[in-house]
Amino acid sequence: MKHHWLAWVACAATALAGGASALWQGEEQPRYQVESLRGRVVWASEAMRRLHGVESDADAAEWLIVLETPSGELHPLVKDARGRAFYKDERLRQMDLELLVRRYPGTPLLKVIRLYRLRDGAKYELDYWCDVCAITMYELKECECCQGPIRLRETLVKP
């Protein structure tokens, strides 16, 4: 009987370990993919009109931003700490960009992680900088520390 009990414990432990291992492996699978995409960020309504002749309601003109790739693909961007910059700073919508993004399964929306300007064969990381407080921010606004002005900063990315 004693050996029977030990065999049962060994089987249960193996089953639990296998289940825990499968559960752990499931958690390790990424919830998103990281990608790098190039193009220009534009208003979705403007891109749909220009590319497909689709008109939007007037109140939707500046409602959604998308990354338009050179091949004409439109990728909508999440409006969050990074994505808000495209709504607030028109200069960003005039630049050739490379965006490092997260793509989540089941949604076309992309979350911007980093943004780079492509100019004259070089790549520059973009953010906002307060010269007084020496802090980085990710959208155009007053400095979070001193409430003073901040500037768009371009930092050369070395190959």
What residue ranges belong to the model's regions?
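Short nucleic-acid-contacting surface segments enriched for D/E, G, S/T with interspersed K/R
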Residues: A81-E98
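Structural detector for short beta-strands of small beta-barrel domains
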Residues: P30-A61
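Short, charged beta-turn/beta-strand-edge "cap" motif at the junction between a beta-strand
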Residues: R102-P108
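Transition segments tied to proteolytic processing and entry into folded domains
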Residues: A20-V34
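Bacterial N-terminal signal peptides that target proteins for export
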Residues: M1-V9
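Cys/His-clustered metal-coordination modules, chiefly Zn-binding fingers
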Residues: V112-P159
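Bacterial N-terminal signal peptides
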Residues: W8-A17
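OB-fold (S1/OB) nucleic-acid-binding surfaces
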Residues: G53-V78
